[in-house]
Curated annotation (Swiss-Prot):
This is Transient receptor potential cation channel subfamily M member 3. Residues 1-894, 949-964, 1014-1028, 1138-1732 are cytoplasmic. Homotetramer. Interacts with TRPM1; the interaction results in the formation of a heteromultimeric cation channel complex that are functionally different from the homomeric channels. It catalyses: Ca(2+)(in) = Ca(2+)(out); Mn(2+)(in) = Mn(2+)(out); Zn(2+)(in) = Zn(2+)(out); Mg(2+)(in) = Mg(2+)(out). The gene is Trpm3. One of its GO terms (molecular function) is G-protein beta/gamma-subunit complex binding. InterPro entries: Ion_trans_dom (IPR005821), TRPM (IPR050927), TRPM_SLOG (IPR041491), TRPM_tetra (IPR032415), TRPM_tetra_sf (IPR037162). Residues 829-851, 1610-1732 are annotated as: Disordered. The chain crosses the membrane at residues 895-918, 926-948, 965-985, 990-1013, 1029-1056, 1112-1137. Residues 919-925, 986-989, 1057-1073, 1102-1111 are extracellular. Residues 192-215, 300-323, 601-624, 793-816 are annotated as: Calmodulin-binding.
């Protein structure tokens, strides 16, 4: 059943089968009961029998996609070793529908297979063995959900080994994609990563620009992760611009796509959710892609299926040719090349290679580097663009590209650095990093193919520029091929910077071919670039190339084909080839009037016929030889003239155009390429004429488009183009008038030989360009033309009338010399008469076959006086004019002609009035004969105007003449008067009819006076308003006629139902309703009495007519009629008139000036005498023409030019052209200045500058950070060097065995800025020969002040420690005191004052005996602070310790004081004891001190609350101090109480520590830093002066406790820029689990006092590097070096380095952090250790 009925049958049966299948579940027959099976079986058989032909037809018509593409599915289950529930393909075993797993086979069919389970697991899953091909079941359209509007994308599921030619056919044929001009393949990381905001913006903008300008395809991975997500964001940001323009194709593995089941279906539209499941390993597709190719290899959740398919597809696309179009092959021998009419040779535009491919690398993993190597090794190699700064692989490639040398070599030091970077970036082992490094170096061997884009670099400001530059470098093509590639991309910036460079070699003709391609593809910038680089348009443009440009199908749509069809007056075949002859006819049709195109002139048509005619049978018809000849008798003469035309076909210039920019501009205008037309307007000569011609052509095409019912947008666009060119003409005229008035007037009047021998004024009138005519320059010229050679400015009308009525008064008038009017126009005939005596005859124009003998016989009148050139009197500018010349010039002035004609016309009207008002006699009277002669001579004048008009053909002359409104009315009036005159000469009753016609005819002649009023400045605009209102009233009359007839017909039919057929019915319909409009309502006839007889008052009875049926309706409809007609429509007409008035009023001045030109031209061409005397002027003109014909040969002048123009020599013409070009340059210069000074442009420039400054500031900040990082690296290396030197010194000391007292003669001046962590550790505590060190640890409360303690960069907790040392000090009670040095705020050292200071101020509270004073020592310059710690021999018992001072180890307690004397020997006794007799020292454990009293350091805080545990950190650590091996400090003599040691503070560091307290069982996280780093004996520096007066020291009681943190610039730098140090915890001692009793504490105190040894302060040194308790030190990183330097400079000027700085923190914040921390969360503990 073929045909449409078969289709209906198929569809109908399909619906039935579908219903039955769903109703009875035909697919599940096996699941049905036995009772239902027979019915189902019967239905199935019936459906099968009915559908068998339809199913076969369906299979035959199977879609091409199903036949060409396949999918892959796993058909063998091999469990994975990692997950036994999954197959090696990635799917669950249960998802293998309909398959028998291998394990099941072994379990259920043991007889068939005896393999073990291990054998099955050892079998490797492979795509070729364990997958099966089947036709694809997923293709169609995706509708992405979840956005504001759903995006759509085409998709298809294909096998991973699909042939690339099938995919390309799918994209170009099925998906209707145009072959790309560039393929951008984006590679990068698949994991999500963040780009810098600025880099992301530049990346997205550049990628979109590269794709939009070149018509590129973008290949990505398709999924919404990693770099693909950033590509999608870029497409999303430009969605409004790029919709339908950018083709983004995602090639993704089918197995990793989320929601695969939603995409299954054949040629379907599937909604797709873009929300990804965070628990799933699959990913969703990116919604901003336009197409998806899903590669299927049978796996699920695994990448890699698309790699091979994507690379093969890119390779195949790169082999495709781009931009191939049908171009004729043109030979230089134009007589032999015209073979393109029969066949067309294909000449591809652009390179002879395929589609260029470029790889774009953004971020990425190690596999991306392998992909880059594969691209570089391909044949031909694919250029790669690397986006530096995006991270990982991109940065490594950029680094290798920057520092590698030719051949892939790199410096050894950089090689190690790069290997370390690879290890850290990809978490690789050394071996893996080396392998990847080898791949990287292989890539660097072809580094010329790699382009690195660095944001902000001078070479690559945009990434699109980097992409295209890389393609040019990698293409390895010739210069013409590179230019064609840039032309296809439309990237003139690439061509200018990369192709047109110095030293580039260009083959002959290559640039001309590029010019042709640029013109066809409408690439204005390339045309400009080619012209700048030496392409000669004169040599380039030939007849054949111009014709090819008119026949191109590229570029914007245009109406040229429709115009040619209108001109040819017939349908054209689809493959019709437009010739230049057709173009000439179209131009003449659009320009209208008498315009004559060069393409239709005899010379060009003969040349065209000789070149192309023999190869073209219809050449003669196209040339128009037969059609254009007006008279039959002239054909023989015309053909003879054709043979006489001398054309040298061997001349190479014969095929070129003298003004190529003219021809190209007209081509651009007709092809609707506005930008190209504007460009060609700027080049070449006669710019003003070109602008006016373009204005007229666009306006005419817009009119044609609106007449042909085309889309309104086309007409509006063409009108807009016309206004643009018109504005250019006016602005150029204004510019030239400002520079030189006379040359500007010459521009308006000189003859344009290339534009139908017209003038700019004539072209402006033809284009109806009112603004151009109304310009001051044009009006001044018209005024001079109007006055002729008369010099009159005031009362010109009265003077002219007086001269006409009294001719002797002419001699008193002033006249202008010829030199005063160098720009004055004249007729061609007069010009030739002036040239005859001076030079031999020269044919100025070619002859044309359309010259009419009648025109030659009539000739023309002298439109203007003959101004013969008098060489002898040129120097005398104001010479006297002869009387005869004055009379002649007077009567030939247009103003005189106007008044002469006006006076004659007024006399004619007076005589006409007399004729129609008086009795008409049998024969005409004298007055009547005068009127008849006036009309008759006026008719002859009208015939002369027609015959002497500019068009060549008689029919065209008539058409042009009838376009004038007054000419049409004059013709009607003359014909009507002629009819009346004929009837008047007849007998009665025709004589009366003639008289009536006279009476009617005079109405028009009165109206004709309005044309005369038009010359007046005030009356002229009103005349035009009347004309406009008349047109509006015509539309109103049509509407009024509808209303009037509706009422009139109804009224007439109701009131007069029994009328007979008559013409009176028409009159009766309109008569009364029409007069009702003006207020005559005929009240007596509205409701006349009718019906019964009426009795008057006098008793008489009046018989009334019977009432008409329905007569009562007439008043009702009359009321409605009057309401609509009198009120609504009349007021509507008034409103329309009002609108017209204001519309015309706004342009009335321009309209009047435009009409003034027409009036001036009319009287300029008229003879001197008015009708009826004009007959004498006609006779004179005939006589002159006959005489001229005798003196000239017939062939000398083929065309008669009757226009008024300025004829100038070639030198003057060149001068005018130069002046015009200067004006154009000045015009564009001023235009650019105005544009640059406009507010919008200034705002834009300012915005760009601010953005650039912002980018520069960002770059400066980045460089500053880079410099800081470099300085930090230098600091670290210097610290390491110092550490190395220290260790070397220690080693040398051990080797030489020198004593420290002899070797350490110089005090160390180590700066606190040392960044070596190990060195700082060694400088972290006191060290004495037999001394003890005590460290107090303080936990850092995060809620405390952040500016005091440095922030550790690690996640480890932090801890402070303070160093203590003990000296053998005895008071009166024999108590040994422990001296403590601790930190207040930032390393300020404070203790109580000495006892001497207490004595000086008795009112002050008591202070501890031990003092710590800080004094500057000018004799020993140091960048740090010298700290003097004093220990007094005596301690008065009457001085009680302060509550707010620190008592270490409970020294202030009575129990401790009582125990101390009995256990501790005195100082002198101790000194006399032998070492063996001294009390043994032991370490004090934590348990021994838990019961000691701990007091606050700060007066701002009271004692700790009882509920708060005093130890919130680790217990104080114990470190054994051994003899330092460093020789940097002096070894002191045994302990002397009279001398105080000097302590120097340096820096601190962190060390991580975690521990548990046995006392509390609470884990405490701590971090440690140390503060005291140096201590020397004061005997080296005159100790007596150092401790002269304790009260004068800053630490005295009489002084305020000073905070030295503000005067320590190095410490401030460390606090303001936190350092990051880390240490490992030291080994802790064993802690007791239970708290000790008070008795045990008392015993411990007693034991402690007995075991306190007198230390000998030798030096403050570091822990030895070999000590087991030394924490491991990591490198410290400083964040600000400049701030440290600045602070050093600021503090260098302070006289007292210990005074508080103004910039320090306010005192209101309280005491130091150390005090407050200890008061809240810390306590002291001490340890004792004796150095062996």
């Amino acid at each position: 059943m073929p045909g449409p009925w078969g289709t209906v049958y198929f569809l109908g049966t399909a619906q039935i089968c579908s219903f039955l299948s769903s109703r009875w579940n035909l697919e599940g027959v096996m699941n049905q009961t036995d009772a239902s099976r027979p019915l189902n079986w019967t239905i199935r058989k019936l459906c099968h029998a009915a559908f068998l032909p339809s199913v076969r037809l369906l299979k035959a018509q199977k879609s091409w996609i199903e036949r060409a593409f396949y999918k892959r599915e796993c058909v063998h289950i091999i469990p994975s070793t990692k997950d036994p529930h999954r197959c090696c393909c990635g799917r669950l075993i249960g998802q293998h529908v309909g398959l028998t797993p291998s394990i099941s086979v072994l379990q259920n069919e043991k007889n068939e297979s005896r393999l073990s389970r291990n054998d099955i697991q050892s079998e490797k899953w492979s795509i070729s063995k364990h997958t099966q091909l089947s036709p694809t079941d997923a293709f169609g359209t995706i509708e992405f959900q979840g956005g504001g509007h759903s995006n759509k994308a085409m998709y298809v599921r294909v096998s991973f080994d699909t042939k690339p030619d099938l995919l390309l056919h799918l994209m170009t044929k099925e998906w209707q994609l145009e072959l790309p001009k560039l393929l951008i393949s984006v590679h990068g990381g698949l994991q999500n990563f963040e780009l810098q905001p600025k880099l992301k913006q530049v990346f997205g903008k550049g990628l979109i620009k590269a794709a939009m300008t070149t018509g590129a395809w973008i290949f990505t991975g398709g999924v919404n992760t990693g770099v693909i997500r950033h590509v999608g964001d870029a497409l999303k940001d430009h969605a409004s611009k790029s919709r339908g323009k950018i083709c983004t194709i995602g090639i993704a593995p089918w197995g990793i796509v989320e929601n695969q089941e939603d995409l299954i279906g054949r040629d379907v539209v599937r909604p797709y959710q873009t929300m990804s499941n965070p628990m799933s390993k699959l990913t969703v597709l990116n919604s901003m892609h336009s197409h998806f190719i899903l590669a299927d290899n049978g796996t699920t959740g695994k990448y890699g299926a698309e790699v091979k398919l994507r690379r093969q597809l890119e390779k195949h696309i790169s082999l495709q040719k781009i931009n191939t179009r049908c171009l004729p092959f043109f030979s230089l021998d134009s007589r032999l090349f015209y073979s393109f009419w029969g066949s067309c040779q294909l000449d591809p535009i652009g390179i002879g290679q395929g589609v260029p491919v470029v790889a774009l690398i953004v971020e990425g993993g190690p596999n991306v580097i392998s992909i880059v190597l594969e691209y570089l090794r391909d044949t031909p190699p694919v250029p790669v663009v690397v986006c530096d700064g995006s991270g990982r692989a991109s940065d490594i490639l950029a680094f290798g590209h920057k520092y590698s040398e030719e051949g892939g070599l790199i410096n050894e030091s950089l090689r190690d650095q790069l290997l370390v970077t690879i290890q850290k970036t990809f978490t690789y082992t050394r071996t893996q990093a080396q392998h990847l490094f080898i791949i990287l170096m292989e890539c660097m061997k072809k580094k010329e193919l790699i382009t690195v884009f660095r944001m902000g670099s001078e070479g690559h400001q945009d990434i699109d520029l980097a992409i295209l530059t890389a393609l040019l470098k990698g293409a390895n093509a010739s210069a013409p091929d590179q230019l064609s590639l840039a032309l296809a991309w439309n990237r003139v910036d690439i061509a200018r910077s990369q192709i047109f460079i110095y030293g580039q070699q260009w083959p002959v003709g290559s640039l001309e071919q590029a010019m042709l391609d640029a013109l066809v593809l409408d690439r204005v910038d390339f045309v400009k670039l080619l012209i700048e680089n030496g392409v000669s348009m004169h040599r380039f443009l030939t007849i054949s190339r111009l014709e090819e440009l008119y026949n191109t199908r590229h570029g914007p749509s245009n109406t040229l084909y429709h115009l040619v069809r209108d001109v040819k007056k017939g349908n054209l075949p689809p493959d019709y080839r437009i010739s230049l002859i057709d173009i000439g006819l179209v131009i003449e049709y659009l320009m209208g009037g008498a315009y004559r195109c060069n393409y239709t002139r005899k010379r060009f048509r003969t040349l065209y016929h000789n070149l192309f005619g023999p190869k073209r049978p219809k050449a003669l018809k196209l040339l128009g030889m037969e059609d254009d000849i007006p008279l039959r008798r002239g054909r023989k003469t015309t053909k003879k003239r054709e043979e006489e035309v001398d054309i040298d076909l061997d001349d190479p210039e014969i095929n070129h155009f003298p003004f190529p920019f003219h021809e190209l501009m007209v081509w651009a205008v007709l092809m609707k390429r506005q930008k190209m037309a504007l460009f060609f307007w700027q080049h070449g000569e006669e710019a003003m004429a070109k602008a006016l011609v373009a204005c007229k052509l666009c306006k005419a095409m817009a009119h044609e488009a609106s007449e042909n019912d085309m889309v309104d947008d086309i007409s509006q666009e063409l009108n807009h183009n016309s206004r643009d060119f018109g504005q250019l003409a006016v602005e150029l005229l204004d510019q030239s008038y400002k520079q030189d008035e006379q040359l500007a007037m010459k521009l308006l009047t000189y003859e344009l030989k290339n534009w139908s021998n017209a003038t700019c004024l004539q072209l402006a009138v033809a284009a109806k360009h009112r603004d151009f005519i109304a310009h001051t320059c044009s009006q001044m010229l018209l005024t001079d033309m109007w006055m002729g050679r008369l010099r009159m400015r005031k009362n010109s009308g009265l003077k002219v009338i007086l001269g006409i009525l009294l001719p002797p008064s002419i001699l008193s008038l002033e006249f202008k010399n010829k030199d005063d009017m160098p720009y004055m126009t004249q007729a061609q005939e007069i010009h030739l008469q002036e040239k005859e005596p001076e030079e031999p005859e020269k044919p100025t124009k070619e002859k044309d076959e359309e010259d009419m003998e009648l025109t030659a016989m009539l000739g023309r009148s002298n439109g203007e006086s003959s101004r013969k050139k008098d060489e002898e009197e040129v120097q005398s500018r104001h010479r006297l004019i002869p009387v005869g010349r004055k009379i002649y010039e007077f009567y030939n002035a247009p103003i005189v002609k106007f008044w002469f004609y006006t006076l004659a016309y007024i006399g004619y009207l007076m005589l006409f009035n007399y004729i129609v008002l008086v009795k008409m006699e049998r024969w005409p009277s004298t007055q009547e004969w005068i009127v008849i002669s006036y009309i008759f001579t006026l008719g002859i004048e009208k015939m002369r105007e027609i015959l002497m008009s500019e068009p060549g053909k008689l029919l065209q002359k008539v058409k042009v003449w009838l376009q004038e409104y007054w000419n049409v009315t004059d013709l009607i009036a003359i014909l009507l008067f002629s009819v009346g005159m004929i009837l008047r000469l007849q007998d009665q009753p025709f004589r009366s009819d003639g008289r009536v016609i006279y009476c009617v005819n005079i109405i028009y002649w009165y109206i004709r006076l309005l044309d005369i009023f038009g010359v007046n400045k005030y009356l002229g605009p009103y005349v035009m308003m009347i004309g406009k209102m008349m047109i509006d009233m015509m539309y109103f009359v049509i509407i009024m006629l509808v209303v009037l007839m509706s009422f009139g017909v109804a009224r007439q039919a109701i009131l007069f139902p029994n009328e007979e057929p008559s013409w009176k019915l028409a009159k009766n319909i309109f008569y009364m309703p029409y007069w009702m409009i003006y207020g005559e309502v005929f009240a007596d006839q509205i409701d006349p009495p009718c019906g019964q007889n009426e009795t008057r008052e006098d008793g008489k009875t009046i018989q009334l007519p019977p009432c008409k049926t329905g007569a009562w309706i007439v008043p009702a409809i009359m009321a409605c009629y009057l309401l609509v007609a009198n009120i609504l429509l009349v007021n509507l007409l008034i409103a329309v008139f009002n609108n017209t008035f204001f519309e015309v009023k706004s342009i009335s001045n321009q309209v009047w000036k435009f009409q003034r030109y027409q009036l001036i031209m009319t009287f300029h061409e008229r003879p001197v005498l008015p009708p009826p005397l004009i007959i004498f002027s006609h006779m004179t003109m005939i006589f002159q023409h006959v005489c001229c014909r005798w003196r000239k040969h017939e062939s000398d002048q083929d065309e008669r030019d009757y226009g008024l123009k300025l004829f100038i020599t070639d030198d003057e013409l060149k001068k005018v052209h130069d002046f015009e070009e200067q004006c154009i340059e000045e015009y564009f210069r001023e235009k650019d200045d105005r544009f640059n000074s406009s507010n919008d442009e200034r705002i834009r420039v300012t915005s760009e500058r601010v953005e650039n400054m912002s980018m520069r500031l960002e770059e400066v900040n980045e460089r500053e950070h880079s410099m800081k990082a470099s300085l930090q690296t230098v600091d670290i290396r210097l610290a390491q060097l110092e550490d190395l030197i220290g260790r070397m010194a220690t080693a040398l000391e051990r080797l030489t065995g020198l004593e420290r007292a002899e070797s350490n003669k110089i005090r160390s001046r180590t700066s606190s800025d040392c960044t070596d962590a190990a060195y700082i550790v060694r400088q972290s505590s006191f060290n004495s020969q037999e001394g003890n060190t005590f460290k107090l640890q303080e936990s850092i409360d995060p809620a405390g002040e952040e500016t005091i303690s440095p922030t550790s960069p690690t996640l480890m907790p932090r801890m402070r420690s303070h160093s203590f040392y003990s000296v053998n000090v005895k008071d009166k009670g024999g108590i040994e005191k422990l001296e403590s040095i601790f930190k207040e705020r930032s390393l300020s050292l404070h203790r109580a004052t000495s006892s001497h200071s207490v004595a000086k101020e008795p009112k002050a509270p008591a202070a501890p005996a031990n003092t710590l004073a800080i004094v500057p020592d000018s004799r020993r310059p140091s960048s740090c602070i010298d700290i003097y710690v004093s220990a007094m021999d005596e301690l008065h018992c009457d001085i009680e310790p302060l509550d707010n001072s620190m008592n270490i180890l409970g020294l202030g307690e009575p129990s401790f004081s009582a125990l101390a004397p009995s256990t501790t020997p005195s100082s002198s006794a101790y000194a006399t004891l032998a070492p063996t007799d001294r009390p043994p020292s032991r370490s004090i454990d934590f348990e021994d001190l838990t019961s000691m009293d701990t007091r606050s350091f700060s007066s701002d805080y009271t004692h700790l609350p009882e509920c708060q545990n005093p130890w919130d950190t680790d217990p104080p650590t114990y470190h054994t101090i051994e003899r330092s091996k460093s020789s940097r400090y002096l070894a002191t003599t045994p302990f002397l109480l009279e001398e105080a040691p000097i302590v120097k503070s340096h820096s601190f560091m962190f060390s991580p520590s975690r521990s548990y307290y046995a006392n509390f069982g609470v884990p405490v996280k701590t971090a440690e830093y140390t503060s005291i780093t140096d201590c020397i004996d004061t005997r080296c520096v005159n100790a007596p002066q150092a401790i002269a007066d304790r009260a004068t020291f800053p630490g005295g009681l009489g002084d305020k406790v000073e905070d030295l943190s503000c005067c320590h610039p190095e410490r401030e730098a460390e606090l303001s820029h936190p350092s990051s140090d880390s240490e490992e915890n030291e080994a802790r001692g064993q802690r007791a689990a239970n708290p000790i009793s008070s008795q045990e504490a008392e015993n411990a105190d007693r034991t402690l006092s007995n075991n306190i040894t007198v230390p000998k302060i030798e030096r403050a040194n570091s822990y030895s590097a070999e000590e087991p308790n030394v924490p491991y030190a990591h490198t410290r990183k400083s964040f600000s070096i400049s701030d440290k330097l600045d602070r050093q400079r600021n503090t260098a000027s302070l006289r007292n380095p210990f005074q508080r700085s103004k910039s320090s923190k306010p005192e209101g914040r309280g005491d130091s952090l150390s005090m407050r921390r200890l008061s809240r969360t810390s306590a002291f503990h001490s340890f004792e250790s004796k150095h062996n």
